Amino acid sequence: MTLQLTNEWDKVFEKSDKVNHKKVSFKNHFGIEIAADLYIPKERNDKLPAIAITGPYGAVKEQSSGLYAQTLAERGFLALAFDPSFTGESGGGTRYMTSPDLNVEDFQAAIDYLSNLDEADSNKLAIIGICGWGGMALQTACLETRIKAVISSTMYDMTRIAGNGYFDADNNKGARKNARKAINNQRTEDYKNGEYKLAGGVVDPVPDDAPEFLQDYHAYYKTPRGYHKRSLNSNGGWTIQTNGSLANTRILTYANEIDMPVLIIHGEKAHSRYNSETAFDMITGETKTNGVTPEPYTGVYPLGNTKVGNKELYIVEGASHVDLYDNLDKIPFRKIETFLKTNFEV
C-alpha cells in the first residue's frame, strides 16, 4: 500500500528557518511502511550524527517527537521523527495496535534507514524515546548494537503500567485476571462486530477533580497547543484489546546488559517518575527504589544528574510529565546535545 503523506507543514510547532525538512518512508521487517519526517541542518559540511525519535505513546510525529527532532537539527544533528506502525501516516492494516516486539522493530527499522542514508554518519547513531516510547527505546538498546547512545525522556514502562496499573496498584493475580477477562471478552465482541473498539483518547472534558497529570494531558492533546487530527491521544485512542499484548510481556529483562551510554530524563514533579528511577536501577544494578511505588511518588534520586558508569539519570527541577513534551524551558536540550556529542566524540 502506498502511503498518503501530507506535504504541507501541519506540525503543532513552528517551522525552523535553520533546518531543511522532508517526508520520507522506509519498511520494517514485517513489511510495514513507516512514515517519517527528516530534519537536516541547512548549514553542514559532512555526514552528520543521526538520531531516530518517536513518542509519546499515542502521539504522532507532528507533535513532540517532531519538536525534539527539529530542535536537535538546529543543534547540528540529523534527526528522524517517525510514526510507529499502525499509527499516524504509517502503514499497517489494523489501525491503533501496538506490541513491544513491533515497537522495537520500528526503532530498528529506523536505524536500518539511517545506516544507509548518504547524509548520515552510520558510526554515530542514537535513538530517543518519549513517554511510553522511552521504555521501548531502552528495550531496543538491549538488542541493537549499531547505536552509540540511547535517551529516554519522561518515560513510561508501558508493559508495567498495563500489567500492574498506575503505581503498581493492581499488581496482583486477581486484578490481572479480571483485566484479561475484559480484554478477551472485547476480542469476542470485536470479531462479532467486524471492527476493533477504541479505548478513547484523553478524556474531554476533563473532570474538575481529575488528577493533575490528566489535566496536563488534556492541556496538551485536546487544545491547540498540541492537538493533531492523526494523534490517537487527541482523538479515539488505542484499540482496547491491544493492552493484552502489553500486559503479557515485560520489557527490560536484559536492561543490565545495556553497555552503551544511557541518558534517562524525567521531571521532578512527574507522576510517572518511578518508571525512570526503577529503570535506572535495573540497568545500573542499584536498589534505591526497591520496587516500591507509593502514591504520590516523590522520587529517591536527587535533582540534576546522577551518573553510574555509563548510565545517567537526569531529574529536571519543577518539571511535570507533559512539560517534557514541548516546554522548551524544561526540556534539557543542552544536556541532550552535550551527552550525544560527548558519546559521538563530535
Q: Model-predicted segments: where are they?
A:
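Alpha/beta-hydrolase-fold enzymes
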Residues: L138-T223
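Catalytic histidine-centered segment of alpha/beta-hydrolase-like enzymes
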Residues: A319-D329
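Short beta-strand/loop motif that positions the catalytic acidic residue
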Residues: I258, I264-H266
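Short beta-strand element of the alpha/beta-hydrolase
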Residues: K47-P56
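Alpha/beta-hydrolase active-site loop
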Residues: M97-D118
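Conserved alpha/beta-hydrolase
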Residues: T71-G91
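N-terminal cap/lid segment of alpha/beta-hydrolase-fold proteins
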Residues: L3-D46
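The serine-hydrolase catalytic nucleophile loop
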Residues: G58-Q70, P84
